[in-house]
Amino acid sequence: MTTDRRLEILRAIVDEYVETQEPVGSKAIADKRALGISPATIRNEMAVLEEEGLITQPHTSAGRIPTDRGYRLFVDKLSTVKPLSAAERRAIETFLEGAHDLDDVVKRSAKLLADITKQVAVVKYPKIGDSQGREMMAISGTANLARSGEDLGNTLSPILEALEEQVVLLRLLSDAHPTVHVTIGSEQPDSNLQSTSLVTVGYGSDASLGILGPTRMDYAGSMAAVSAVARYVSRFITEGGK
């Protein structure tokens, strides 16, 4: 069973890897984290984390990177949703206050989420009244995937195809929870998206929004941004844009 100390080491590996994109070694953790233990002890604990399938060693490196299971444990047990700064909250409010109708607010929300998280943002339109029309969504930030080419490798093309078709994303967004939900890597039901993570939340009548990006993402920041934008969009709909 993973101890509190190992969880702290896992947190350090995730944080460092997300920030640097480089596999993480025991010395880097000892130098940057006040854990009060030696690099040798950290190496021993990392060996256990590797046995538990939470981290893995790339072929060309002495360091370790998180696995999908490691990210899942990080999100479930370690990651606290960090609040947005006052400046970020004001930026969201100001940007969305300029919207003059539902279509505008949905498109603005997608662009805003993509800009904040540097990932692909998807926003599903809410149902209006008894409308039985086809489901619609707005997508922004597709170019951000190209900047993640090293993370996504040869899976980039299938991901772009899935985004273009939209059917897969609409199905995933239809399963969105009223609270922020994270689907990581191999948990994705569509095999074309299993090098990505999806952070989603519902915000209105059969409506949802979220971001899609490589599994090496800032989960805490992405969860905070998705939650905050959903609150503002929900308020816009409830108050009729006032």
Task: State where each predicted segment sits.
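Conserved RecA-like P-loop NTPase ATPase core
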Residues: 9, 67, 211
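Intrinsically disordered, acidic Ser/Thr/Pro-rich low-complexity regulatory segments
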Residues: 72, 79-242
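Alpha-helical hairpin
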Residues: 1-2, 37, 66, 84
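Short alpha-helical segments that sit at the start of domains
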Residues: 1-11
